[in-house]
Amino acid sequence: MKLADCPVFPAEAANALSTDRGLGWRLARQAGPVLRHPATNGMFANFVFAVGREEVLANLDDARLDRARALPESDLQVHQQLFAPKSAHDLAAQFRPTAAALIDRFAAAGGGDAVADVTTPMADALFDSVSRLQLLPVEHLNGRSGHVLSEACRNLFKHAGWHLLELACNPELCDVLRRQPELIREFIEEILRLEPMVPSCQRFTTQPTTIGEVELPADVVLNLCIGAVQRDGSDPMSTDDLVIGVRAHRHWTLGAGSMRCQGGHIVRQVLRVLVEEWVDRAGHIELAPGFRPAVAFPTTQSVLWLPELPLVTRA
């Protein structure tokens, strides 16, 4: 099939993704395993979306496809200490008092906007913790590496809003996690699966390539929609439901193979601190009446995040 004959990403799917990822991705998968952007000119005219499981997973680490890297390989050598598992533990310990203080202040105020009051300042606090622990050389922290790290911290805590949303909507879950903290790890993995930090991983064709029987020319931006795969119902572990107490569901939110997120240890340790402190200090906080969480489905691989999260003390 030629790209021009490929079905487009349905408008109803894109609209649904803003409030219901399960419905949105289901509508996209029903339209076909490979979809093109509806734009016929401009920067999005060469965007293609793979939403089928086989089409996504087969190409996450395909050497034939180019991918954008935030930093060159030579710079990544400097980050070995930062990405070490021990550093993630040290960073989480350094970050915990700040997280506890922010959550305490939020709870004492009776709530507010958790994005503005909790998760956004946490991003700066995490960056400062990296600096205090000297996990990156000063010249790199003040250069390109520091810029990338700062953006990564912001993206991590944009994603953290989904954890707080689920906890605010489900007081019984808060109680379970408080009584059984060993389940917090599974809870974190489930939110990572259901609300991936980046819903699609971008790859770039450098030569004519066939994906899911669709012939793609060179210079196509291929969006591998892991968000669609992780909810596709192909097995009992890939559903729209949050399930804990069985075992962690497999997901590709943090990449795969050579494209696996090297900061994965940090992501998990920091999110664990956030959830532990929240269920201990703010389990009585709930979603503000009448608020309906909505996001804008990104046309690039930008983070899908909640711009606001108004919470109040449970009556």
Residue ranges and their predicted role:
Residues 1-315:
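Cytochrome P450
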